[in-house]
């Protein structure tokens, strides 16, 4: 793939050159090649995008739910039609294997749009009778313009997840993708326009954290939806509340426990632990990186992990047979490799991997070997801190009460999972785990019907599921009096 020319922003239904005079580059993490030069948005560009969104939102909100649904479904059809083209672009930008992006990233983004397209005509209020001559009815009205800030690990999926409920409810969006993986956002904007979305209803402003700050502080933004790390999320929330008391939805980090009891199907649990740590090279917020294994099953479970790690096929992400790609950037590679070194320093035993993969044929890419640490303790930094890479920590436990206490001993609360053939125990344990997304005898799938979000410092609000529509509407109450009006004057 040859380097693309400087890419514009997308404002008011068309490409628009950034006015800041600044640009940034986007590279392929597999070989370091240049993919694109992108224009950095200025404050004037953000203002223009918000104004375009305000104009477009009025037209969009005036449509019926059925009319909005038809347009969203046309966008779904275009996404599915262009799945392979978009998957290739996503793979070259993120480094994720084409086997993943072609089967998950665009598919699940389109699924979310299709799901909320079906719900758009069903958004309704309620009627509350007070007496024969008096009643109250409610309307669920859109918030207005949503500022959406995406993460770099699932660029187009996250854009769709944020757009779907917001658009279904009649809002407009100004979307800022991560500056690390910004390429598919512009394609999505073009698809929305082609599908018939009114000009200005979906805008894209490119750039670094400065652009995100412009959105969170903008008086024309009614709500901010952010996906990213906890530290940035706190800054976003402070800015959103400090400017105009904006509503916020946040999907933040995690250090999720995956608990394997001795009675579990160990092959199934080992398969899940592999997916929960090495899919997308470990760059998934819900990953089960703290793998607690009942002591009597630990040795057998570890043997199954070693066998499975040996079967991983790393290589060119465009090769359909490859199932493990590089990390998203060379900067992120440095972070992950530093944690692998730290794990060794703090006494964790390397069960598999532990290599830098930065020499020979691997030197040109942002690689880190899939790594399994064992004999870990809860105090180790590789156990406590989010690494966001292919690093699994295995910890032994002796009883149910102990593992629940240790699993909950974290500032995070995004996800959790239990593997046991006793469904009574599995449900009992899950109900005591402090996490918003939980799985029993499986891991990782987040269908559009399932609310996604975290407890504690892992987030606020939810994405996906019916209840998320409530986060993109506001309730107006109307009281009607059909009898005489009584005044004390």
From Swiss-Prot:
<comment type="similarity">
    <text>Belongs to the aldehyde dehydrogenase family.</text>
</comment>
<protein>
    <recommendedName>
        <fullName>Betaine aldehyde dehydrogenase</fullName>
        <ecNumber>1.2.1.8</ecNumber>
    </recommendedName>
</protein>
<keyword id="KW-0558">Oxidation</keyword>
<dbReference type="InterPro" id="IPR016162">
    <property type="entry name" value="Ald_DH_N"/>
</dbReference>
<feature type="site" description="Seems to be a necessary countercharge to the potassium cations">
    <location>
        <position position="247"/>
    </location>
</feature>
<dbReference type="InterPro" id="IPR011264">
    <property type="entry name" value="BADH"/>
</dbReference>
<dbReference type="Pfam" id="PF00171">
    <property type="entry name" value="Aldedh"/>
</dbReference>
<keyword id="KW-0560">Oxidoreductase</keyword>
<keyword id="KW-0479">Metal-binding</keyword>
<keyword id="KW-0521">NADP</keyword>
<feature type="binding site">
    <location>
        <begin position="150"/>
        <end position="152"/>
    </location>
    <ligand>
        <name>NAD(+)</name>
    </ligand>
</feature>
<feature type="binding site" description="covalent">
    <location>
        <position position="285"/>
    </location>
    <ligand>
        <name>NAD(+)</name>
    </ligand>
</feature>
<feature type="binding site">
    <location>
        <position position="180"/>
    </location>
    <ligand>
        <name>K(+) 1</name>
    </ligand>
</feature>
<dbReference type="GO" id="GO:0008802">
    <property type="term" value="F:betaine-aldehyde dehydrogenase (NAD+) activity"/>
</dbReference>
<dbReference type="InterPro" id="IPR029510">
    <property type="entry name" value="Ald_DH_CS_GLU"/>
</dbReference>
<feature type="binding site">
    <location>
        <position position="253"/>
    </location>
    <ligand>
        <name>NAD(+)</name>
    </ligand>
</feature>
<feature type="active site" description="Charge relay system">
    <location>
        <position position="162"/>
    </location>
</feature>
<feature type="binding site">
    <location>
        <begin position="176"/>
        <end position="179"/>
    </location>
    <ligand>
        <name>NAD(+)</name>
    </ligand>
</feature>
<feature type="active site" description="Proton acceptor">
    <location>
        <position position="251"/>
    </location>
</feature>
<feature type="binding site">
    <location>
        <position position="93"/>
    </location>
    <ligand>
        <name>K(+) 1</name>
    </ligand>
</feature>
<dbReference type="GO" id="GO:0019285">
    <property type="term" value="P:glycine betaine biosynthetic process from choline"/>
</dbReference>
<comment type="function">
    <text>Involved in the biosynthesis of the osmoprotectant glycine betaine. Catalyzes the irreversible oxidation of betaine aldehyde to the corresponding acid.</text>
</comment>
<comment type="subunit">
    <text>Dimer of dimers.</text>
</comment>
<feature type="binding site">
    <location>
        <position position="459"/>
    </location>
    <ligand>
        <name>K(+) 2</name>
    </ligand>
</feature>
<dbReference type="InterPro" id="IPR016161">
    <property type="entry name" value="Ald_DH/histidinol_DH"/>
</dbReference>
<feature type="active site" description="Nucleophile">
    <location>
        <position position="285"/>
    </location>
</feature>
<dbReference type="InterPro" id="IPR016160">
    <property type="entry name" value="Ald_DH_CS_CYS"/>
</dbReference>
<feature type="binding site">
    <location>
        <position position="456"/>
    </location>
    <ligand>
        <name>K(+) 2</name>
    </ligand>
</feature>
<keyword id="KW-0520">NAD</keyword>
<feature type="binding site">
    <location>
        <position position="245"/>
    </location>
    <ligand>
        <name>K(+) 2</name>
    </ligand>
</feature>
<feature type="modified residue" description="Cysteine sulfenic acid (-SOH)">
    <location>
        <position position="285"/>
    </location>
</feature>
<comment type="pathway">
    <text>Amine and polyamine biosynthesis; betaine biosynthesis via choline pathway; betaine from betaine aldehyde: step 1/1.</text>
</comment>
<dbReference type="InterPro" id="IPR016163">
    <property type="entry name" value="Ald_DH_C"/>
</dbReference>
<dbReference type="GO" id="GO:0046872">
    <property type="term" value="F:metal ion binding"/>
</dbReference>
<feature type="active site" description="Charge relay system">
    <location>
        <position position="463"/>
    </location>
</feature>
<feature type="binding site">
    <location>
        <position position="386"/>
    </location>
    <ligand>
        <name>NAD(+)</name>
    </ligand>
</feature>
<keyword id="KW-0630">Potassium</keyword>
<dbReference type="InterPro" id="IPR015590">
    <property type="entry name" value="Aldehyde_DH_dom"/>
</dbReference>
<feature type="binding site">
    <location>
        <begin position="229"/>
        <end position="232"/>
    </location>
    <ligand>
        <name>NAD(+)</name>
    </ligand>
</feature>
């Amino acid at each position: 793939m040859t380097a693309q020319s400087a890419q514009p922003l997308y404002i008011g239904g068309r490409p628009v050159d950034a006015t800041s005079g600044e640009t940034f580059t986007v590279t392929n993490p597999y070989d370091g090649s240049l993919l694109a030069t992108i224009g950095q948005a200025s404050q004037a560009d953000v203002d223009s995008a918000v104004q375009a969104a305000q104009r477009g939102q009025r037209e969009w909100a005036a449509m019926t739910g059925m009319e909005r649904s038809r347009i969203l479904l046309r966008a779904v059809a275009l996404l599915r039609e262009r799945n392979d083209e978009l998957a290739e672009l996503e793979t070259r930008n993120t480094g994720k294997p084409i086997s993943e992006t072609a089967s998950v990233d665009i598919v699940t983004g389109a699924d979310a749009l299709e799901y909320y397209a079906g719900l758009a005509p069903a958004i309704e209020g309620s009627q509350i009778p007070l007496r024969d001559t008096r009643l109250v009815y409610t309307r669920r009205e859109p918030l207005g313009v949503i500022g959406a800030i995406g993460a770099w690990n699932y660029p187009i999926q996250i854009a769709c997840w944020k757009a779907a409920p917001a658009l279904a409810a009649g809002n407009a969006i100004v979307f800022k993708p991560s500056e690390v993986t910004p390429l598919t956002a512009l394609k999505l904007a073009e698809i929305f326009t082609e599908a018939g979305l009114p000009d200005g209803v979906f805008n894209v402003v490119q750039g670094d954290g400065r652009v995100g700050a412009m959105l969170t502080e903008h008086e024309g933004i009614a709500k901010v939806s952010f996906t990213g790390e906890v530290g940035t999320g706190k800054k976003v929330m402070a800015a959103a509340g400090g400017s105009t008391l904006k509503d916020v939805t946040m999907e933040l980090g995690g250090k999720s426990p995956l608990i394997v009891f001795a009675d579990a199907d160990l092959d199934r649990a080992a398969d899940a632990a592999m997916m929960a740590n090495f899919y997308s090279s470990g760059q998934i917020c819900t990953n089960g990186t703290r793998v607690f294994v009942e002591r009597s099953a630990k040795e057998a479970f570890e043997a199954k992990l070693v066998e499975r790690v040996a079967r991983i096929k790393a290589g060119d992400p465009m090769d359909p047979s490859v199932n493990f790609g590089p990390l998203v950037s060379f900067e992120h590679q440095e972070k992950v490799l530093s944690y692998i070194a730290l794990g060794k320093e703090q006494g964790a035993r390397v069960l598999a991997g532990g290599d830098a993969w930065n020499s020979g044929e691997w030197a040109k890419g942002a690689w880190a070997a899939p790594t399994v640490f064992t004999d870990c303790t809860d105090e180790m930094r590789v156990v406590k801190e989010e690494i966001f890479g292919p690093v699994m920590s295995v910890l032994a436990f002796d009883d149910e009460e102990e593992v629940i206490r240790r699993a909950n001993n974290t500032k995070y609360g995004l996800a959790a999972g239990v593997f046991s053939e006793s469904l009574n125990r599995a449900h009992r344990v899950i109900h005591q785990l402090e996490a918003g997304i939980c799985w029993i005898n499986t891991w990782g799938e987040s269908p559009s019907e399932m609310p996604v979000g975290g407890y504690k410092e892992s987030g606020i609000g939810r994405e996906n599921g019916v209840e998320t529509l409530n986060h993109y509407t506001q309730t107006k109450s109307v009281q009607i009096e059909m009898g005489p009006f009584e005044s004390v004057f």
